[in-house]
Amino acid sequence: MKTEKMDFDSLTAEQIGKLFPIRIVPYNPDWEMLFEREKVLITEVLDKDVTFGIEHFGSTSIVGLAAKPTIDTMVEVSKLSDELKQVITRKLETIGYGNMYNSENDSKMTFGKGYDENYACTQTYHVHIREKGDVPQDEIYFRDYLRDNVVACDEYAKLKYALAEKYQFNREEYTQAKTEFITKITELQKNKNR
């Protein structure tokens, strides 16, 4: 049975939460391989003159960490003109990605795949497109700290399980409730790098 890509632009946050509840799963050692495979696909469809770097970030990039089964990929590109946004959208659609909350005015874009009627048993993927020089280093600082600190990693896993239970159908509240912990860890890594 063929599945249709999800059109996130037509859904409210409440609808998204009900269709795709938060679920945290134990660490999967295949996540790194899945990222590498996705990186190859993305590199093949996006012009090498446009793409400056591709990073795996988010919880699936941290060995041993429980996570939503979503591979987050950061792609750094040249200036995001309207024309380039259209080209990127078209090219990512060829490998199954749908547009997620992208505004005409943003200097960033987000795409997703794996969101369909089989969501409960599907690996999902997000591609975060950022302009060169606008890559959010805080996400990399956070990732790097947790990669090196088992205690903080365990603490974060416990927090995520608790919040996923509390905010199972509200992705925005789930994300917001993690902010204090993420900010604290990010600052620790920044201070470590000084």
What is each stretch, according to the model?
Residues 135-194:
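Catalytic cores of NTP-dependent nucleotidyl/adenyl transfer enzymes across multiple folds
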Residues 41-71, 76-81:
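Active-site nucleotide-donor binding segment shared across nucleotidyl transfer reactions
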Residues 20-30, 74-80, 142-146:
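Short histidine-centered catalytic/ligand-binding loop motif
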